[in-house]
């Protein structure tokens, strides 16, 4: 098998319209299209996020506890912008010596992170 790349990241939600407002209006991701059966796709840079309600195909909903890291130019500025829009963060912004990270959740409890690597990657 040859994997070409990750095609999309699936984000399960309970309220698609509320999620659309959060991901598109609050986070500023680019809306692409509605998905038949309920849901939508939006873009974070070159990564497609497919946001949908799993209950539409009789699957249970459970929020994803594993962070989706959103790369931003300045974590402090992005955090201040989101806090101004009512987004609550889980903890102080972390400086790991390699990157800055700030953790938060979407309205359905899916884990998200603002991220910026500032140290060079090792070869």
PLM segments and residue spans:
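Short secondary-structure junctions
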Residues: 28-34, 89-93
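N-terminal beta-strand motif that seeds the catalytic metal site of vicinal oxygen chelate
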Residues: 1-18, 48, 66-70, 118-123
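Acidic di-acidic motifs
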Residues: 15, 74, 106
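Short, conserved charged micro-motifs
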Residues: 18, 75-79
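Short hydrophobic/aromatic beta-strand element in the GNAT-like acyltransferase core
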Residues: 10, 39-41, 69, 101-103
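Conserved short beta-strand elements that form part of the metal-binding/catalytic scaffold
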Residues: 30-63, 111-117
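Conserved active-site tyrosine of GNAT-family acetyltransferases
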Residues: 19-26, 82, 109
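Vicinal oxygen chelate
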Residues: 1-2, 79, 83-123
